[in-house]
Structure formats: C-alpha cells, structure tokens
C-alpha cells in the first residue's frame, strides 16, 4: 500500500509527463458507497491537486447523498482531519459555479423547530384537554 505522499508524487509526475489530468481513487477503509478521488491537473507548468467524491458505481456522475451515507461521510471527514496538514500543502480546489444555481443557507436548528411544530398541531387532543 502506497502512502498518500507517494500517491501525490506519482500522480503529479504522471500529469506533468502526459500533460493531462491524472486521477486516482483512494480506498478509505470502511466506506461503502462513496469514493474519494485525488486529481492532479497540469496548469501553467505546475500541478494543481483536488479531491472530489463520487458514487462507487459511477465515477463520472454527480453524487446524490442520503441519510444512509452518513457513516461514509463521517469516515471521509476523519480522513480529511487526519491528513489535513499534508493535504493543505497540495490540494487546492476552487468551486466553479457556472450554472447560476441559487444557493440558500439552512439553519439546522431552526429547521428542526419548524418540523416539530406541525407535529404538535396534528396531535389529537383528548376530551380533558379540549375542555
């Protein structure tokens, strides 16, 4: 098994020699449905690195996530935290949003409160509670 440093060096060398994007899927122990892909992109004589996540079944497609993916995402977060100092040296990713997609921030605590209120309204009251 190669170290992350060896993988990054090998990808960088491959991308520079071939002058095209070189990618490698990183198999993180315990992840079931989601894979992490490390990309080396040649750009103006230098190599730019990025990390992306994909469905294990189809690496080229955008991934939709479900609550069942929580454990996989937790393991990815642990991987990112463990190697953060090292990854920060290499991985630079600037999200591009060319599609004019509207973005909204969601406050999870407020959302939970809103979801609880309708449940209380829908609760049937007993005769004692009514009078």
UniProtKB/Swiss-Prot annotation:
Where is there biased composition of kind Basic and acidic residues? 114-131
Stretches the record annotates as Disordered: 99-131
* Highest rank taxon of the organism: Viruses
Q: Which Gene3D superfamilies did the record assign?
A: 3.30.720.60
One short Pfam name that applies is PHA01746
Q: Where is the composition biased (Acidic residues)?
A: 102-113
**What name is this protein filed under?**
Uncharacterized protein 131
């Amino acid at each position: 098994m190669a170290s992350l440093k060896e993988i990054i060096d090998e990808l960088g060398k491959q991308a520079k020699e071939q002058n095209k994007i070189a990618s490698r899927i990183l198999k993180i122990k315990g992840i079931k449905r989601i894979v992490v892909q490390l990309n080396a992109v040649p750009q103006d004589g230098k190599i730019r690195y990025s990390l992306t996540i994909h469905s294990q079944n189809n690496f080229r497609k955008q991934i939709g996530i479900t609550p069942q993916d929580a454990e996989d995402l937790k393991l990815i977060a642990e991987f990112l935290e463990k190697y953060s100092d090292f990854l920060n040296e290499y991985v630079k990713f600037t999200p591009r949003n060319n599609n004019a997609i509207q973005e909204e921030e969601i406050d999870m605590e407020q959302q939970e409160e809103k979801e609880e209120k309708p449940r209380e309204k829908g609760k049937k009251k007993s005769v004692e509670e009514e009078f």
